[in-house]
Curated annotation (Swiss-Prot):
Changing G277L: Impairs CEK1 activation and invasive filamentation. GO terms for biological process: calcium-mediated signaling; cell adhesion; invasive filamentous growth; MAPK cascade. Residues 43-269 are extracellular. This is Cell-surface associated glycoprotein DFI1. Glycans are attached at N53, N65, N87, N100. Belongs to the MID2 like cell wall stress sensor family. The chain crosses the membrane at residues 22-42, 270-290. It comes from Candida albicans (strain SC5314 / ATCC MYA-2876) (Yeast). GO terms for molecular function: calmodulin binding. A motif (Glycophorin A) lies at residues 273-277. It is a multi-pass membrane protein.
Length: 337
């Protein structure tokens, strides 16, 4: 009677090899997931870095036509969402020829003086203008706000002419508008007074600093003043051009989505993060379930002893040439040992 035993060491080796294969698969999956997430965060950090491209201009910079020397775009002078940097030129021109005709309302000029001021969206700007004449009192005020600019100028001639001028400007978004206006002016000569009174001019300048906001409204103003003397009467005509613009809501949204023109937008980064996180978790869960089922189906139930019945092999060399197990009830169990 032969007594055969199964090599438990071989079974243990096969079980351990299967276990090591499963652990290796899990390690590979976790490593791939970590590399994917790391790449995503590196790309997100790279996309958040500012990209300075001086060859192109973002779409929210509105061109301004019809102005001379009013606009000076510089990347160091504007914030995100701002319109740009404007230089506003104010010209005061006085008639110097002998023609005192006032029929056209606008007079040619032969001399001019220029005052330049630079408003910005984050600091207060001051504009001062002074003008003196023997028979004129001039008051000029300039108020800068985030929504509009107002220019009020009044000239009074003493003793024989009164000229009133008022101008109010408006801002329009998102287009750029140039408004030129001349107010009503009345001349009331008074010949009863022959006294010449010399009055010094008074100039008042006031400014208020604008409040910074994400959508900044910027405006520039160009003022030209013409003056002429007609039979002892001083006639002043002021022409004011106001250019105001502000970025629209669609431009602001496009700037947020483009994120300085490089990489994925904010919404796309959120979508990619959700897809990577949820998809990676589902993939790891499926692999874990498959590995568990495979391990469960491959369990070995071959432990213990295996007996052969007597004279079952009949001298054959084939290993499985008999019935496994002691199943013959007539067999003597004691003879097997």
């Amino acid at each position: 009677m032969e007594k055969l035993s199964i090599n438990n060491n071989n079974n243990n080796r096969r079980y351990q090899s299967r276990r090591f294969d499963g652990i290796t698969i899990i390690r590979i999956v976790v490593l791939v997931f970590i590399v994917t997430v790391s790449t995503y965060f590196v790309n997100s950090y790279t996309c958040n870095q500012p990209h300075h491209n001086h060859s192109t201009r973002p779409s929210h910079y509105l061109p301004i036509n019809g102005t001379h020397g009013l606009m000076n775009n510089d990347d160091s002078l504007h914030n995100k969402g701002a319109i740009g940097h404007y230089n506003t030129t104010v010209s005061l021109e006085r008639r110097a020829d002998e023609n005192n005709s006032t029929t056209n309302g606008l007079f040619p000029s032969t001399s001019s003086s220029t005052f330049i001021f630079t408003p910005s969206s984050s600091s207060s700007s001051t504009f001062q203008q002074s003008r003196s004449s023997p028979q004129t009192t001039s008051t000029s005020s300039f108020v800068a706000t985030t929504s509009s600019f107002q220019q009020e100028t009044s000239q009074t001639s003493i003793p024989d002419t009164t000229t009133d001028f008022s101008f109010s400007s408006f801002s329009e978004a998102p287009t750029t508008s140039t408004t030129s206006s001349t107010s009503e002016f009345s001349s009331t000569p008074q010949e009863t007074s022959n006294t010449v009174t010399s009055t010094s001019s008074t100039s008042t300048s006031s400014s208020s600093s604008p409040t910074s906001s994400p959508a900044t409204t910027s405006a520039s103003q160009h003022v030209t003043t013409f003056s002429s003397v007609d039979n002892g009467k001083t006639i002043v005509v002021t022409r004011t051009s106001v250019i105001s613009s502000s970025p629209t809501a669609s431009n602001s949204n496009n700037n947020k989505n483009n994120d300085n023109g490089g990489g994925l937008s904010h919404t796309n980064r959120i979508v990619v993060g959700v897809v990577v996180g949820v998809g990676g978790s589902i993939l790891i869960g499926l692999l874990a379930v498959l590995f568990y089922l495979r391990k469960r189906n491959n369990r070995d139930y071959e432990g213990g002893w295996t007996f052969w019945r007597k004279n079952e092999k009949l001298g054959s060399d084939e290993f499985f040439n008999g019935e496994l197990g002691v199943r013959d009830r007539n067999i003597n169990q004691g003879s097997n040992f």
